[in-house]
Amino acid sequence: MNRRSFFKGGLSMIALARMAHALGDSQFFQGEVPRGPFLPFWESLKSYRCPDWFRDAKFGIWAHWSPQCVPEQGDWYARNMYIQGSRQYEFHVKQYGHPSQFGYKDICHLWKAERWDPDALVKLYKRAGAEYLVSLATHHDNFDCWNSKHQVWNAVNVGPKRDIVGTWAKVARANGLRFGVSYHGTPHRTWDEFLPVRYKSDSTGPLAGVPYDGMQTISDGKGKWWAGMDPQLLNGKPHKKNTPCPEFVQQFMLRVQDVIDSYSPDILNFDDGARFTFDDGGTGAPDLKVWLGIPDLAPQIMAYYYNKNIQTHSGRLEGVVDLKEVDEPIWGTLTRDFEANLADSLQENPWQTEACIGGWHYSRWLFENHAYQKPSLMIPLLVDIVSKNGNLLLSIPLPGHGEPDSDELAFLDELAQWQEINSEGIKGTRPWKIFGEGPSTEVKGIVAYQLSKYKFDSTDIRFTTKGDVLYAFALGWPSDNQVLIKSLASTAPHYERQIRKVELLGAKSAVKWTREPDGLRIRVPQDPPCHHAYCFKISPA
């Protein structure tokens, strides 16, 4: 059946059931496919509702940690180390040797995680306000960070000799956090972007034409540390970009199934997207394109995951699928991912964005130059996101040994101090009728890190609600000790109730306030109770 006509007109439940039965035993999954209310089609997935725990949580920490953190040279090391002339290639040759002799598999071998204390880290994250932890399961490098059944190049067999994902899951849940995984090894990103460079060679220099180690086979490992392991299972069979990859797609699906079945994640995050393109000649019916590699791959994963999650939680759906580049026709089927970007308006459905205080993989240069993003950026970022019905997943990148550096510890401590005072206005809240007021509300299409360009002041206000209580965050401290909230003017349409009490969270004394025709005027103490964003609790009469 034509996908366009299906999406436009829908199908009867009988037809859907027949199609679900036909695909239910798809070659992509092994064993019994969980039955449930969700069928592997976008139309069926429209009945999804985001669970309340995710809407309440607001903030999570992302353990974006893999062998690529070992060189401490930032993100995409597993690709750029094979690109002659790149900064990471030059570092690699100087530090480890030429990639024909010392390749990415050898970087994986160096990952020991010898100073990793997951329980201590999770306690730090929880103190900083995290309600969930997301572990990187597989990056574009094609290395699995768990005891993978379908990839021998994994963290139990190579490197740390530990189940990284499983350990994070156990420790997070023991500390009362929800747990999720992020999966980046999709066909589009891994097969097309990361693996093909491993089969190339230098174009100039003394080793020009000598193939990189991506061309090695199991027979080349005799007498070496990786003897008996086939490097082509890590690097893929030699191929060029845009080469069909049915075997890799099959393995991708089995690995996703494995991580779902093994750890029952509360969040399933993909560093990829599901995008529609409207090329039907103007009729408005979508021609489905799924970036994960083949059409209809994403809905098969989602139906499997949602139904499995319902079984795990005794009939309740507690799972969240997080995808980027999602266009409007399927917004309600999942949780939209805005990676490093902000929504510029209040969103009807819950959403999430990811941000990082440094590079996605650890960078020694950023630490040594004290160049991390500061709490002065990330705290207003969190408040802005929550006011628009979103969540923030924040990465604090770990070095390969697993111990955060001193600047990261200082960041977490400052965030924890702020959360101790202000989390009441964040956790468990819902958006108000409007998300905010002030000059920064007019900024459109902003990238998260660009917030540092804007100097927030006390006229930049963000709102959240919890029950009858309204919270108003001022993103700056007033020089004249007065905050004016125009949206709460006595004549404003948004808040018609009488105000009984106004409190400044963390303040040692009560604040004075008056509600006037031009706004709610609050006189604040000389010294702020915290830094970066200041929360007023407004209770109705």
For the regions a language model picked out, list residue spans one by one.
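N-terminal export signals
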Residues: 5-25
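Mature catalytic domains of secreted/periplasmic carbohydrate-active enzymes
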Residues: 23-541
